[in-house]
């Protein structure tokens, strides 16, 4: 998705946790740490983190969103990382979601529908 085509929104209390996407076979485990989401869109998430993730790293993230029943598992890539000027967490991190659809390395259309619904709800509040 193009960056500019996705409206950013924030939902207080939203958290993210992640694991590295396995390259071939095998499994990886989610970190025990979870981090606050600053804002999100249909295209990605901006969050605070203590780990310096590598730009280009492939992740699988779970996002816990207050007021929703699901905790979507989303395939993403790290797009940027910078030092956090605040004292709370060491880094600010931006990830981009893989495209939506059927097939390997694609995110489900249900996730896209959920994000669209959350975006609509945030429009009504703002």
What are these regions (language model features)?
Residues 48-49, 84-97:
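Short, solvent-exposed secondary-structure boundary/capping segments
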Residues 35, 73-82:
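Short beta-strand-centered aromatic/proline hotspots
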Residues 20, 42, 81-87:
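Short, conserved beta-turn/loop elements at beta-strand boundaries and strand-helix junctions
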Residues 94, 102-111:
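A short macromolecule-binding patch
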Residues 14-18, 58-71:
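Short conserved beta-strand and strand-loop elements enriched in small hydrophobics
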Residues 21-63, 94:
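Short strand-loop-strand
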Residues 9-10, 29-32, 65-75:
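Short coil-to-beta-strand transition motifs
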Residues 1-40, 113-126:
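N-terminal helix initiation/capping motif
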